[in-house]
């Protein structure tokens, strides 16, 4: 969906949803659409290949099974590039990439890999240390089993075989997705709150545009470490970093949508 103001400008926000999400799932989208369009900024929200737990994609005359349980993180380059090409065709030349949760990792990864001069700003809603999140919220038995079984199945040529993964709403994830993207030192592992405030992230250090970071003080996914550690880590790694905390907000900004809209309105 593309939301446009009555008087259109050349600026658009591209929203990238999180793990197993969708373009319409987050209830804050309607509020942000109103907030952005009142400022003369358009908003595009779209499904990427990590949408829902399992989904179907029509390629030619054949259906391919995709979804968050099967996606490879690196393929986000194709999804975001498609969205950017779409808005460029509509003559937008100032792009704000906005990610929520796992979408934050994707927009940072895209920015670093593509270095598109049309990208003028990043908005990160609830950026997570994915690997620490797994370690903290999975039982020790499940964590160890996922590590062992995913490696075994990938080696056997069975990356699409499902494993139990209690952090997903459907309780499943494919061996390949976990092995390639959720273990430490994989391509997603560049937000490392677990390493402390002085730890350096090349991917975050390389960002040369302003970054707005927003999360709640009740965000169970971001706050795998103390909130002050998270804030200092981000400030020490991102050159132009504006951090805004919403009191009482969880990872989905439940019942804090208006407050999120106010933060966006005051900081974009």
Q: Which sequence ranges carry the predicted segments?
A:
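Short beta-strand/loop motif that positions the catalytic acidic residue
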Residues: 207, 213-215, 219
């Amino acid at each position: 969906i593309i939301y446009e103001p009555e008087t259109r400008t050349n600026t658009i926000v591209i929203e990238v949803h999180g793990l197993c999400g969708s373009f319409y799932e987050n209830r804050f989208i309607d509020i942000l659409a109103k907030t952005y369009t009142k400022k003369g900024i358009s908003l595009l929200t779209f499904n990427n290949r990590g949408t829902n737990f399992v989904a179907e994609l029509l390629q030619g005359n054949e259906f391919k099974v995709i979804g968050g349980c099967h996606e490879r993180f690196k393929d986000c380059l194709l999804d975001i590039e498609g969205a950017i090409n779409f808005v460029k065709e509509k003559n937008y030349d100032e792009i704000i990439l906005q990610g929520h949760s796992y979408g934050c990792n994707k927009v940072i990864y895209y920015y670093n890999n593509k270095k598109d001069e049309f990208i003028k700003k990043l908005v990160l809603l609830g950026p997570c240390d994915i690997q620490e999140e797994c370690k903290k919220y999975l039982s020790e038995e499940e964590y160890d089993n996922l590590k062992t079984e995913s490696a075994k199945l990938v080696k056997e040529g069975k990356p699409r075989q499902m494993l139990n993964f209690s952090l997903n709403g459907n309780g499943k994830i494919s061996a390949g997705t976990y092995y390639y993207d959720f273990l430490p030192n994989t391509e997603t592992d560049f937000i490392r709150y677990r390493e402390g405030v002085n730890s350096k992230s090349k991917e975050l250090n390389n960002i040369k545009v302003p970054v707005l970071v927003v999360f709640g003080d009740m965000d169970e996914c971001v706050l795998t470490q103390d909130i002050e550690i998270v804030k200092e880590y981000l400030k020490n790694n991102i050159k132009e970093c504006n951090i805004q905390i919403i009191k009482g907000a969880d990872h989905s900004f439940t019942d804090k949508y208006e407050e999120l809209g106010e933060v966006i309105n005051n900081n974009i």
